[in-house]
A protein has these predicted regions:
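Conserved N-terminal Rossmann-fold NAD(P)-binding element of oxidoreductases
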Residues: 3-9
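C-terminal catalytic/substrate-binding lobe primarily of soluble NAD(P)-dependent oxidoreductases
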Residues: 159-408
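Rossmann-fold NAD(P)-binding glycine/threonine-rich loop
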Residues: 101-137
């Protein structure tokens, strides 16, 4: 498979590192607005299958030109969600296959944003499904860790473990710390703000999708593998859009284990207006407060050797098991930063994200997954994906939970 990866930040660089160990990749172009950053990712893998290019991910025509030059089987979007639509549209126009790890951005409801959704995550992409089907190409959207592996867990739960799903919550948490920083997100601050400060999206059977105030439904969840209890809140996330489209569940939500200090910091950022995307004039210079904040914080790709701890992504499912009795499980994946740095030179959060598009690409390349049109991870059988996780050096587990309050 010939791949073009757009974005040479933490996730894009990790994709290159992992892909260099997989023979199904015949060639991979790593492209970035900074040619030197793309070249650094290629130099690190030291593999003749890999090359670097420069591209402006906000410019559809520039992306189209690179697609024509690289002639890939698939384009992998490894930049933040602002650039989903330019890359997606460039692939549509060039009739080339596409994969991303985050979907097109949402827009709040114009008059009632804390109760009703406006434009949901991914709506812009799914609105073009007929065109993709007509073109004979595929787009696999939301194929990172969350969304991505978490959606695969949801599909597995329905197929193998449950006869009825009452409650499904993707639960993300970690005990990661960064030396020398009180506040240093391990992922793009632009994306973190977008997820955490937008009204959270929730799905309920019979009601459909609705929204709440940011940071709603605070609960402390005890994460596995020594991570322990972390304060979790509702957050807007793609799984809440994708999972109800293919998995029958009475309730779906995403809860992010941010921790009390992180939550308070984000609230302060919002209070000060530093989360705003729109540019303002500062002494004659036009600048976006969110872009300024991102420039002030450390690049997550550079934090690996300063990070300690583990990160966990998983799906909590409650309902009736295949035997008709109450059942609750947490299906999860944990990555230790010490392990990912030692074996790949990538910090845990970006490595955990990067393996998933590659597993999906391998399943497509060998004909196990057969995407057509626009697809999410839960469109496909889960077991082949889960079987490949161990080949990529990671693992997945099922923890039985107390099935409290589940009525037959």
């Amino acid at each position: 498979m010939k791949a073009l990866v757009i974005g040479a930040g933490g996730v894009g660089s990790a994709i290159a590192n992992i892909a260099s160990r997989r023979p199904f990749i015949t060639s991979m172009v790593i492209a970035d607005r900074s040619l030197s950053r793309a070249q650094a990712a290629v130099t690190k893998v030291n593999d003749p299958r890999f090359s670097a290019q420069e591209v402006d991910a906000s410019d559809v025509n520039d992306i189209r030109a690179l697609i024509r030059k690289a002639a890939p089987d698939i384009v992998v979007n490894a930049v933040d969600p602002r650039f989903v639509m330019p890359i997606f549209l460039a692939c549509e126009e060039e009739k080339v296959n596409y994969m991303d790890m985050a979907m097109s951005l949402s827009t709040p409801h114009p008059t009632d944003p804390m109760n009703k959704p406006g434009v949901k995550l991914g709506d812009e992409q799914f609105a073009r499904a007929d065109t993709w089907s007509k073109n004979g190409n595929y787009a696999v959207v939301g194929m990172g860790i969350e969304p991505g592996m978490s959606d695969v867990f949801a599909r597995y739960a329905e197929d193998e473990l449950f006869s009825r799903i009452d409650y499904l919550a993707v639960m993300d948490g970690s005990n990661l710390t960064v030396d020398g920083y009180d506040f240093a997100p391990s992922f793009s601050i632009w994306t973190t703000i977008e997820e955490c400060l937008n009204p959270p999206l929730i799905f309920e059977e019979g009601r459909g999708w609705y929204t709440t105030e940011p940071f709603s439904k605070l609960e402390t969840y005890d994460f596995p593998d020594g991570i322990g209890p972390v304060e979790c809140v509702n957050v807007e996330h793609e799984e809440v859009v994708l999972i109800p489209m293919k998995v029958k569940a009475k309730e779906v939500r995403f809860k992010y284990g941010l921790g009390a200090q992180f939550i308070e910091t984000l609230k302060t950022i919002h209070t000060l207006g530093l989360d705003k995307k729109e540019k303002i004039s500062v002494q004659g210079v036009e600048v976006s407060p969110r872009d300024l904040l991102a420039a002030l914080l450390p690049d997550p790709a550079t934090l690996g050797d300063k990070m300690h701890g583990k990160t966990c992504a998983g799906t909590l499912v409650k309902g009736l098991g295949k035997d008709g009795n109450p059942k609750a499980v947490y299906i999860y994946n944990v990555v230790d930063n010490e392990w990912s740095m030692k074996n790949y030179g990538n910090q845990a959060v970006v490595w955990q994200t990067a393996i998933n598009p590659l597993i999906a690409m391998e399943l497509i390349a060998n004909g196990t997954w057969k995407p057509a049109g626009i697809n999410g991870p839960e469109w496909f059988p889960a077991q082949p994906f889960l079987d490949l996780i161990s080949e990529y050096g990671s693992s997945w587990h099922i923890r039985e939970e107390e099935p409290k309050g589940i009525v037959k």
